[in-house]
């Protein structure tokens, strides 16, 4: 089954409100195997709403609308649906009585007795439409069959929309689809690999599954990491798990050391877990990341069992005074080099009495530094057996580079503790670590 999302409201077009409803609906529909082909935003105009509905019905089986069901003059979804279907509006007696009861129960209107005249618009329905109950607000939803398709309209208020979709819209969609209602996802989280490398490693498996159609693999890159999502549809969970198992095995084999966990894991949590298992501790020295690395580690409950603390040595002279980095080294190579990162790591390890010292230095931009291009990153990791480094060129703007730097640093610790290769990111590349 194919679905299109249609959001109504000038406020969405002007950027006053972000369309978070579309993201939420997309996830819910994907979970039950409904394919969302298009997501559209249209302004508060009856003709534009009607046209958007007609176009969507030409391409999809169901159209799911949000917004424009309020009581004011610019709430025009009801009129737009009626225009798309070529029908008029009718006042629904049951909805009118429900509206009066809702206002009375909420103590609104004239002393809780009279509904403002404008609100009665919410009791209007296109001819032939069915109302969808709203358990938390005054605006009922709309279910309208037009041709062979169905239009569902829900309020734009997220908590009202979420409840209505779960209680009324989704069950109706599943009845119409006549497809297995069980959809299971398996997520593999990766780090230390460019997104393109993850996709290339799984290209053969993706091609094989494309010919079969079930399960499916999707790549979700964000925050410097790539998630691999395997989705199977089946009659029950056990059957879906059986479909996923060989695909997961093939993916783990192809990605190797790049996989660090599943859906509920975080890279920082995995690193701290490895440290605790070894009765080891970690301290960090940060330049380019400016405290972000320590922040990620301390976001994990119980981090104090393995995390000693950190030093933000942002200025070059602080690298010497706080960490003991040799001033001659800083003069010769500057603050941004692999040798400086190694010295910072050794310094913070010694200063804070940790088993391992981790350091980051680089150029976040927007201007180059010491003739080093924006995106240059050097990481040092000092431990009982010596020091290792990782150097990489990261893409993006300043916030993105700093986020990626944190992920790359944590991944270096993970690989070292687990006895895994230092990864392809010891060389310059493009994409997300």
Swiss-Prot record:
Family the UniProt entry places it in: Belongs to the CinA family.
Coiled-coil ranges from the UniProt annotation: none
Protein source organism: Frankia casuarinae (strain DSM 45818 / CECT 9043 / HFP020203 / CcI3)
Pfam families with a match to the protein in the record: CinA, CinA_KH, MoCF_biosynth
Stated name of the protein: CinA-like protein
Cysteine pairs bridged by disulfides in the record: none
Cross-referenced HAMAP family: CinA_B
Domain of life per record: Bacteria
Classification via InterPro entries: CinA (IPR050101), CinA-like_C (IPR036653), CinA_C (IPR008136), CinA_KH (IPR041424), Competence-induced_CinA (IPR008135), MoaB/Mog-like_dom_sf (IPR036425), MoaB/Mog_dom (IPR001453)
């Amino acid at each position: 089954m194919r679905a299109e999302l249609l959001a109504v409201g000038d406020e969405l077009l002007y950027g006053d409100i972000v369309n978070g409803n579309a993201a939420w609906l997309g996830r819910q529909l994907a979970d039950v195997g409904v394919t969302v082909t298009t997501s559209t935003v249209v302004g508060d105009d009856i003709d534009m709403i009607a046209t958007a509905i007609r176009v969507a019905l030409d391409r999809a089986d169901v159209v799911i609308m949000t917004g424009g069901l309020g009581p004011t003059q610019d709430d025009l979804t009801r009129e737009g649906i009626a225009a798309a279907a070529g029908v008029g509006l009718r006042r629904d007696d049951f909805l009118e009585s429900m509206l009066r009861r809702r206002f009375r129960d909420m103590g609104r209107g004239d002393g809780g007795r009279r509904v403002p005249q404008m609100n009665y618009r919410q009791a209007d329905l296109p001819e032939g439409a069915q109302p969808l109950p709203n358990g938390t607000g005054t605006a009922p939803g709309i279910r309208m069959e037009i041709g062979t398709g169905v239009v569902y309209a829900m309020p734009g208020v997220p908590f009202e929309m979420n409840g209505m979709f779960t209680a009324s819209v989704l069950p109706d969609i599943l009845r119409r689809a006549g497809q297995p209602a069980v959809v299971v996802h398996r997520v593999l989280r990766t780090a230390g690999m460019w997104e393109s490398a993850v996709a290339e490693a799984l290209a053969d498996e993706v091609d094989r599954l494309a010919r079969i159609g079930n399960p499916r693999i999707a790549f979700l890159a964000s925050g410097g990491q790539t998630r691999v999502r395997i989705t199977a549809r089946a009659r029950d969970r056990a059957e879906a798990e059986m479909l996923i198992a060989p695909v997961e095995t093939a993916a783990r084999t192809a990605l190797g050391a790049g996989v660090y966990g599943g859906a509920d894991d975080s890279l920082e949590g995995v690193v701290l877990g490895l440290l605790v298992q070894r009765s080891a501790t970690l301290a960090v020295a940060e330049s380019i990341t400016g405290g972000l690395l320590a922040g990620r580690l301390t976001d994990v409950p119980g981090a104090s069992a393995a995390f000693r603390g950190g030093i933000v040595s942002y200025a070059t002279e602080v690298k010497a005074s706080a960490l003991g980095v040799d001033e001659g080294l800083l003069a010769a190579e500057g603050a941004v080099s692999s040798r400086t990162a190694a010295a910072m790591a050794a310094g913070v390890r010694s200063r804070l009495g940790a088993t391992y010292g981790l350091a980051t230095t680089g150029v976040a931009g927007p201007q180059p530094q010491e003739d080093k291009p924006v995106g240059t990153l050097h990481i040092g990791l000092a431990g009982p057996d010596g020091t290792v480094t990782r150097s990489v060129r990261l893409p993006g703007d300043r916030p993105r580079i700093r986020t990626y730097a944190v992920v790359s640093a944590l991944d270096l610790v993970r690989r070292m503790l687990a006895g895994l290769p230092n990864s392809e990111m010891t060389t310059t590349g493009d994409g997300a670590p």
